[in-house]
Amino acid sequence: MESEDHLYSGVIGRVQWFARRFGWGEIVCLPFRILASRIVVPFLRERHFKFRGGLLPCFYAHYNVTWCNERAVEVPLGRWYLEQAAEEAARVLEVGHVLGHYGDHDHAVLDKYETASGVINEDITTWQTEERFDLILSISTFEHIGFDDDAPGGSADKILAAIAACRNLLKPQGRLAITVPLGYNPELDRLIERNELGEDRGWFLLRHGPREWKEVARHQAMGTPFGRPFPFANALLVAEFDAPN
């Protein structure tokens, strides 16, 4: 699929996509959040959230105004996985160029559309490589697959194909870890609800305040709407997949 199939290619396309997914109200609010960011962030109280028995600090950055969206927890989650991998001298691939916007990293990055130094512009389902990875990590990328493009075919099948492709690139003891928001992509939500995503392990985070997230049981997170009551994601799934047998 060529880049013109991407719904948010170009400035006009990106504005149209943003309004379609998040509403015109967010189009109005976003510039004010960006302008206010350098004033607001220094005064924000440090917060933490629990994940797998430990505490991780929320992450506030001006880029993408992480202090008012799910990146506040997704970036720390991504860094947690990278730290685990670094302790084991693991080979890492990130699918979707996200963490590079918030600091320097030396792992491989694959992104179908975003051009940046060192980023491999390939589709994960067709990428040919002899390399195998201990960890494949993806931050809020899989919900866009088949949903934010004009290519024919259902999103669910494409998401499952991308998961299968990632798992096939893992070393025997490797794992794929992804974060996805609930309530954004209806087909992805149905996969999760029906236990058809195929994850081996999963953890759910629910937003209880503008910058307050808590790990909750599956039934507490399912059905959480996107964009209400707080902007953007109000619940996340962190899913892990093992290498195929």
Task: Tell me what each language-model feature is.
Residues 137-142, 146:
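A conserved beta-strand element that flanks and buttresses the S-adenosyl-L-methionine
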Residues 92, 107, 176-178:
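Hydrophobic/aromatic residues located in beta-strands of well-ordered beta-sheets
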Residues 1-19:
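Boundary detector for helix-to-coil junctions that initiate low-complexity/charged tails
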Residues 20-86:
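Class I SAM-dependent methyltransferase Rossmann-like catalytic core
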Residues 65-68, 145-245:
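S-adenosyl-L-methionine-dependent methyltransferase catalytic module, highlighting the catalytic core
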Residues 75, 100-102:
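Glycine-rich SAM-binding Motif I of class I
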Residues 86-99:
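Conserved class I S-adenosyl-L-methionine
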Residues 102-138, 151, 157-161:
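Adenosine-cofactor binding site in Rossmann-like domains, unifying the SAM/SAH pocket
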